[in-house]
Amino acid sequence: MTVRAYDNQHPEIDESVWIDPSAVVIGKVTLGREVSVWPQVVIRGDVNTITVGSQTNIQDGAILHCTHDGPYSPGGKALTIGERVTIGHQACLHGCTIGQEVLIGIGATVLDGAVVEDQVMIGAGTLVPPGKTLESGYLYVGSPAKMARPLKDHEKEFLKYSALHYIRLANNHREVTG
């Protein structure tokens, strides 16, 4: 794994975090308890802060970045991710806020200033445009993201299950690879 400082800002990584050797974590990044970071993930906190809540999993090839302070984005946009979030393979999160117990589908993109409230599912390939808010308790799909329907009880339970499953899987990888 590559974990490195940028501009004298060092990642803060809880000792329980598992990071695949091919992942990259750079700069002003905080990874909470039992976070797992899978192959080819890039978490680049070079121009603003990235905070990842406990028990979140960031799956293969996902990209997490933020927005710099500049004339087109005064103050920039940090990336904040809540607890028990599943970030699917090759998803891209950029300068947005993600609540608790959220599933971001494979290849989904969530852009600057978007807010995803708690207990939301975002379908594979969905585009959440800048500044959009996704209300709690719904499935969103499409480009741009549209509310499809309320989540069913078993889907809300799956949000927790997915997070816990990835903790077990990361622990297994840690044991197998040493």
Predicted regions and their residues:
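C-terminal segments of enzyme domains that contribute to small-molecule binding surfaces
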Residues: 2-16, 20, 71-92, 136-178
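Left-handed beta-helix
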Residues: 15, 20-21, 26-27, 32-33, ...
